[in-house]
């Protein structure tokens, strides 16, 4: 059990940011808007600082106009959002059934309308995944408007349900913790080989960042964010 989430006093955060010699900061939290009231209070306190910030939250922020607008007013310019996969079955298994692939395009468009860049990781290696998932995900992420992404192979952290499942099924292949980095297949995938999983993650990047898709994405980003911001997007 992770226990209860602890929150820093907002005045402490504001004081620390005020002393920084920068107008761009990362509000580091695994789920910045988990406590909605806290997030609203924080965003209001950030407004006078006139900063730009990056943070991590869930796609639910797209369906909360008050919270999204408050984030934008406070300087939100870049959000890492856990989408992970277009597979509904895999999302449900990961405890993210609230992510509805059919709604993501409009939700991301709503975030873009507030001048906010959307980043998300593409997670591969779910039991529901077959070798077709890599190109499917690249196309899906492009079509729904993801701005930045990188692939990662699912990591079975010790103590997690995923780890226990793989252990029970005798599918763990490595106890070298240095390989538990999202780049190595440390377990036997269900519907492909380890080599296919590792190569597929690279294949995803090649397709998402192909010349044609990158050019199309840049044109859309110029429209959404302007040229200066677009040139800063990797």
Residue map of PLM features:
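Radical SAM [4Fe-4S] cluster-binding motif and immediate context
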Residues: 1-119, 124-126, 132-139
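A generic structural motif
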Residues: 55-58, 149, 153
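Short gly/pro/ser/thr-enriched loop/turn and capping motifs at secondary-structure boundaries
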Residues: 87, 156-158
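Acidic, metal-coordinating catalytic cores used for nucleic-acid/nucleotide bond scission
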Residues: 128, 155
């Amino acid at each position: 059990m992770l226990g209860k989430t602890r929150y820093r006093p907002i005045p402490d955060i504001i004081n620390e940011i005020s002393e920084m010699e920068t107008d761009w900061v990362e509000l580091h939290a695994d789920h910045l808007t988990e406590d909605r009231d806290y997030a609203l209070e924080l965003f209001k306190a950030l407004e006078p600082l006139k900063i730009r910030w990056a943070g991590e939250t869930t796609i639910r922020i797209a369906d909360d106009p008050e919270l999204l607008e408050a984030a934008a007013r406070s300087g939100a310019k870049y959000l890492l959002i856990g989408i992970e996969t277009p597979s509904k079955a895999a999302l449900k298994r990961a405890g993210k059934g609230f992510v509805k692939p059919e709604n993501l395009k409009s939700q991301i468009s709503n975030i873009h309308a507030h001048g906010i860049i959307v980043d998300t990781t593409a997670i591969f290696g779910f039991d529901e995944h077959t070798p077709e998932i890599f190109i499917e995900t690249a196309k899906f992420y492009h079509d729904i408007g993801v701005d930045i992404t990188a692939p990662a192979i699912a990591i079975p952290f010790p103590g997690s349900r995923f780890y226990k499942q793989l252990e029970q099924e005798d599918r763990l292949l490595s106890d070298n913790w240095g390989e538990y980095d999202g780049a190595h297949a440390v377990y036997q995938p269900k519907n492909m080989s380890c080599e296919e999983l590792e190569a597929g993650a690279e294949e995803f990047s090649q397709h998402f960042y192909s010349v044609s898709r990158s050019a199309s994405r840049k044109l859309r980003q110029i429209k959404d964010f302007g040229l200066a911001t677009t040139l800063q997007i990797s």
